[in-house]
Amino acid sequence: MSLPASFDLTPEDAKLLLAANVHLGAKNVQVHNKPYVYKTRPDGMNIINIGKTWEKIVLAARIIAAVPNASDVAVCSSRTFGQRAVLKFAAHTGATAIAGRFTPGNFTNYITRSFKEPRLVVVTDPRTDAQAIKESSYVNIPVIALTDMDSPSEYVDVAIPCNNKGKHSIGLIWWLLAREVLRLRGIIPDRTTEWSVMPDLYFYRDPEEIEQNAVEEAKTEEVEEAPVAEAETEWTGETEDVDWADSGATPAAEDAAASNW
């Protein structure tokens, strides 16, 4: 049985996945993740089959697009590298973002102010977002997760095999997922039309690095705006010939010789 054309990985997307190191998996392999291993390197690192990664991205996007109300999809990331990505994903698709620490009882304790009743949960890492997955299992909410080769698969309904520890890998997977959701909703007309949003927008940025870059840019602007004083006259290394007899002036050496010491 052949898959639809949308499940075919394009060369451009394959280059993006490889450039972001999505294919670099962990050395340990959980039994349910074995079908996603393409090969094992001599150093023990497992290479993920990015073709299957793309198939799972398309499948997850179809599940997300099938939810009538976009805000009923909760996207979670306790991992620092994924917090910016889930916020951007929520902004572009209308989902509800839970970035940072997941408050226990968000899905089960209706007394809390942060209580939510999503119809679908998407998490960045089954280990760091274990509380969200556990509560989803209590209230029968399906879970989509970005899973590495060593990630646990309990209560995960759809696993997207990828490197869920690198900031570029996490950002790119969320970007591809958002783009596919927008394609299915018709916001992006067809697959030949490129999305105007760059993947860099989903990448984690270190606040200290941002401040340092801002300081360096300010210094560069100050140096460029400072006026450069130009010399009014240029010395050519040539001396002018002066006729001391006509001018009535005598050189300093002759004055010194004529004086009475």
Swiss-Prot record:
Location in the cell: Cytoplasm
Record keywords: Acetylation, Cytoplasm, Ribonucleoprotein, Ribosomal protein
Annotated Acidic residues bias: 222-244
Domain of life: Eukaryota
Pfam families referenced in this protein's UniProt entry, alphabetically: Ribosomal_S2 (PF00318)
Annotated region (Disordered), positions in chain: 217-261
Modified-residue entries (N-acetylserine), positions: 2
GO molecular-function term, one example from the UniProt record: structural constituent of ribosome
HAMAP family per the UniProt record, alphabetical: Ribosomal_S2_euk (MF_03015)
PANTHER family assigned to the protein according to its UniProt record, in alphabetical order: 40S RIBOSOMAL PROTEIN SA
Record-stated family: Belongs to the universal ribosomal protein uS2 family.
Function (record text): Required for the assembly and/or stability of the 40S ribosomal subunit. Required for the processing of the 20S rRNA-precursor to mature 18S rRNA in a late step of the maturation of 40S ribosomal subunits.
Subunit structure and binding partners: Component of the small ribosomal subunit. Mature ribosomes consist of a small (40S) and a large (60S) subunit. The 40S subunit contains about 33 different proteins and 1 molecule of RNA (18S). The 60S subunit contains about 49 different proteins and 3 molecules of RNA (25S, 5.8S and 5S). Interacts with RPS21.
Protein name: Small ribosomal subunit protein uS2
UniProt lineage: Eukaryota, Fungi, Dikarya, Ascomycota, Saccharomycotina
